[in-house]
Amino acid sequence: MRKILCSLLLFNLCSVFSQSEITTDELYDHISFLTSTVNKGRYPGSSTNKKLVKYISKDFKNSGLEKFDQSYRQEFVAELRVSKYVDKKPEVKTWNVIGLLKGNDPKLQNEYIVLGAHYDHLGHGGPSSKSDQLDTVHPGADDNASGTAALLEIAERLSSIQSQLKRSIIFVAFGAEEQGLLGSKHFVENSPVPLAQLKLMINMDMVGRLNEQKQIYMGGAGTFPEGQKLMAELGKEAGLNPVVHAGSVGGSDHVSFYKKNISVLGMHTGGHKQYHTPEDTIDLINFNGEKMVCDYIFQTIFTLASSAHRLKFIAQD
């Protein structure tokens, strides 16, 4: 298996060498828009929600992603966490944003890798805030404008080499993650393709604060064959120090997929004291580090989508 993985790495690195790269400028532009005060902390059901969905949809279209059912939008109703003391919680309409890159292998094109990130945040705080400044916009630069920006940039780069893909790739910007993984729960209950055809879900939640040790953390690497080896080797190739957990799945949108017996990887660059506060701002994002993380995740998806590497769910204790 090690020889197979090495061959895959060499082939894929040569294949993508001449492609245009993800840039820190593009990542900055996305995060700058998402964290702008006019977006009011990206709260589900807010007046800016449609604008965010339109922005992501437009970027998917510009990258050449296909629609499901003639739309990038998947509408659902989110029950908001306003207070633990409120019995009947308010409900609002919001959306997941979904795009597709079709693979080219007659058989493997019916197997899908899902790349996802939630685009919502806390608005002005609420019960999930760690701050007492509940009248202040929580911009959520790392959580999770960083993951949303990564999603858009990786989608664009993969689209440019679509002809080399065997498996298909679904890209999802989830809504209402902060309200209890509601967007991803809705997706797996209303998947545009049969769940049995979803072979791996990679989730990016807080990928913008790479530390000096260049540690990228992930859970779920043991949920598919040779996952730990593959992620460790690809991480080193990317110049990162991957902290690979086999059985610790984590607690973000990928958990909704794991509960449906779908292999997962949950990617993040670690926690920090600005988490869920108004201080999670764009000036603290490590853009060079986020680019490295994006390149790593891009290479992971390309390696698995352009080969016949077996993807089978392995439950973890």
Language model regions located:
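Bacterial Sec-dependent N-terminal signal peptides
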Residues: 1-22
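N-terminal hydrophobic or amphipathic helices/low-complexity stretches enriched
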Residues: 16-67, 110, 317
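Second-shell loop/turn segments in exported
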Residues: 20, 37-47, 83-88, 133-144, ...
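Solvent-exposed loop/turn segments at secondary-structure junctions
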Residues: 38-41, 60, 66-67, 82, ...
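A non-catalytic alpha/beta surface segment that caps or lines the substrate-entry region
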Residues: 42-102
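Alpha-helical metal-binding/catalytic segments enriched in His/Glu/Asp
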Residues: 108, 115-116, 126-179, 297
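His/Asp/Glu-rich mid-to-C-terminal helical/loop segments that flank catalytic regions of hydrolases
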Residues: 160, 273-317
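Metal-dependent peptidase/peptidase-like ectodomains
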Residues: 174-272, 312
